């Protein structure tokens, strides 16, 4: 397994170009199964989960190519089963189910894998498809969906806010007969992006970005060209990297309006921030950040995917900050690793109390999930001495060339190839 070797401390400064958002690219790639004509998807990040998805779409019979953009022609799809060998590494595979049953009347997906963060069941996806008229069976580790004729529009009230299930219901409803209303829908920018992509192919979706999405079913979707929005979590991660090192950064190809909660907290921490249409700059003027209190919440609240990075910020800040995680259980796995580097923190159920220290020390640490592992790499950049981050395949699932981008900001980081 590959590792990162990071030598610190360094002050990170310079420019970084933000990649397309994985969490928008994945649902968009799966939603392309609904289209009868070729689509071109631009600004797709080069990541393991994206490669797996392209492989999966190919196995279903789609023609998939990558040359700059990703090109998908789902016209020839003639296989309706997403097999275990591809699904096991990636939870997002469940997103194949809605489009398959909506367009072809049948679909089956092996129960998914992915990051080990708490309970993330697929039951909300299943109940949503059932309300649209699909018959669902769970057999031999597969979720099997079928419908005679077309799915039927329905008024669906989500039990709890779920990005994944909102995508499933919204994509399936585009080809359903009649109108579907999703109440208590997720409002994330990646949902908006997926809806905008579907509309570009001829879908009729309104209300994306609010908690009430209305989808008027259409007979078919055609082709089109679409550009994936910038990755707000990657943007936030690099902004934190500069903030904790007293540095200065310019993020290009960013989308500031997707990061309001994060930018507000960085300003509270003492960062000088400016934004333009597609850029964000942050300058700490060499200062140490001030501790901030953070409570994660569904969008437009503070994103859970930025929690680990802000935990680290608090652990090296002036003062004491409290982090409350309301979205996922089991999401403080980075803290014991940071304590090995000299951090001071106590965890009480879903709350972490972080006491800032002036300096962390390099240590051997282990990545446990995608965002936690990013915080360990950033910790290595500012710690005294050498940090080895093990199991970095987690990082490769969500960050495109993170070591190259950090090196360009002055970090001393190398990938060490594993056996």
Swiss-Prot record:
Pathway participation: Cell wall biogenesis; peptidoglycan biosynthesis
Entry's localization field: Cytoplasm
Family: Belongs to the EPSP synthase family. MurA subfamily.
EC identifiers of the protein: 2.5.1.7
2-(S-cysteinyl)pyruvic acid O-phosphothioketal modifications at: 115
Organism of this sequence: Klebsiella pneumoniae (strain 342)
Function: Cell wall formation. Adds enolpyruvyl to UDP-N-acetylglucosamine.
Binding-site positions, UDP-N-acetyl-alpha-D-glucosamine: 91, 120-124, 160-163, 305, 327
SUPFAM superfamilies assigned to the protein according to its UniProt record, in alphabetical order: EPT/RTPC-like (SSF55205)
Highest taxon of the lineage: Bacteria
GO molecular function: UDP-N-acetylglucosamine 1-carboxyvinyltransferase activity
Class in the EC hierarchy, top level: transferase
Keywords: Cell cycle, Cell division, Cell shape, Cell wall biogenesis/degradation, Cytoplasm, Peptidoglycan synthesis, Pyruvate, Transferase
Active site: 115 (proton donor)
Name of the protein this chain belongs to: UDP-N-acetylglucosamine 1-carboxyvinyltransferase
GO terms classed as biological process: cell division; cell wall organization; peptidoglycan biosynthetic process; regulation of cell shape; UDP-N-acetylgalactosamine biosynthetic process
Annotated phosphoenolpyruvate binding sites: 22-23
GO cellular component, one term: cytoplasm
Signal peptide boundaries: none
Catalytic activity of the protein: phosphoenolpyruvate + UDP-N-acetyl-alpha-D-glucosamine = UDP-N-acetyl-3-O-(1-carboxyvinyl)-alpha-D-glucosamine + phosphate
